[in-house]
Amino acid sequence: MKVFFTAWILTLLPVVAACAETGLADESKRLGSLPSKAKLSLDEDWSSGKINPKRWYALRKKWGQGNFGVVPENVALVKDLVGAKRQRVLRCEAHGDQYAGPITGQWKRKKRVGGVLVSKQHFASGRFEVVMKIGSVDNPRPRGIVPAIWTYGYRAVSVPAKLSDNFSPTQPLYHPSLQKWGKGQALYWSELDFPEYGKGGRFDRPMYNTFLNSKHQPLTFDAHGAADGRYHTYTTEWRTGLAPIKGVKDSQVAKAKGFYWVQDKAVAFGLYLGNPLKRLGRDRYAVCSGLTARHWIDGRFIGENKTFVPSMGGQLNLGVWLPKWAGPAPWKTAAVYFARIRVWQYGDPGDVLGILTEDITDNFGKDGQPLRR
């Protein structure tokens, strides 16, 4: 009997271990309670009936190929049924290949014009909760549109072209490895997409992308049918931290705007990717690093970004656009709707705020002509 009991226990142990591992895995995917340090930084339900210009601004801008931008005229507050309650929501309209109405985008073109609203505030680590509906129950997946939620921040830093291959003692934020759009033109870029639907007209696996300066990782995750013409809650938790970097000396960095910036090519770029450092002591530094961006829809874990996660803050963008890579848009109008928006900031030690501070600039006017700066 003792031998039988021992054998039974030995047989059961792997099963118990497997169940324990499954339980731990399930627990890691659970959307937990907010950290005690979390601060509610944005709570928008549109109940005032107006888009508050101290909180938000609408873009008149074109980027990418095969479209004519986004315009403020395609952004408005309307009434809609959210769950069982009729309330005000943000409506971002898209004009397809058959649109012939009065609203125009770049070059006064009518087709393939969307609408995007952007927060005035820049955010870093924290929880982002956005209630969004794509299309309608009758047409939940309008081909050709890219409905999206994303954070974005940027900063251009310039030096004369003849100095472009080296660091600059007068411009410590300039980095020769971040040159873009010409010699001496460095660009800091922070972006998280959570998510971006519609590539190739598909809505099953939206993109969850990360952009860290010159680095980028595109991922897709199963949205489990959330593009169904109904409201769903999209939640993303962004975390940052400090990653110790060995061998960096005080003589190899310059202090600017509260952070330390590498000024020596002997420090391998791959160790910090253009991110600033924090000083821990004499000849001791840590990189301000993005750690993870984890994603849920209606409380169900969707996936996680762990590569090229930014640490620099960005503004929250909500809306819809129609790039070439979304495919044909064989209809007149479609729309994406946003109900309540909430953002809690965590203030993680790797956060970099106060560096990317500019609003996104318009690049064409109401007349459709490019703006010259």
Per-range role (PLM):
Residues 6-17:
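Bacterial N-terminal signal peptides
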Residues 21-373:
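GH16 jelly-roll
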